[in-house]
Amino acid sequence: MIVGVQGTSSFDNYNVFLRSMAVALSELLEEDKNFHIYSAGPNNINMMAMEFANLSEKGMKLRGKSIKFIKVTPQWLEENISEVNHFAFLSNPKEPVSKIVHVSKLNNINTNVYNF
């Protein structure tokens, strides 16, 4: 399973980020052996995604699955959105969403916007 994440530079609520990952993990099928997080930034989102992957690695391994953090550019994620199974966008209230949110919805990717 491939999860795309992106957010705004002002977003700093790690608990909401964890909730977004819990929602994505709930879609992980039994036959899925990989959980890859493609993070399109900015840096604060990349750091949350990397921390989540590092902290979850042991638990995932015990379940016979692997987790991997991959930093990508927003352009790359937009161009390769069809490879993504789930997309999460994280922002504070009243902040605009990125173009990737619209592109992922147009491509019927399960898209969630978290703005708390």
Q: Can you say where each PLM-predicted feature lies in the sequence?
A:
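Acidic/glycine-enriched connector segments
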Residues: 10-116
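STAS-typified acidic loop motif
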Residues: 2-12
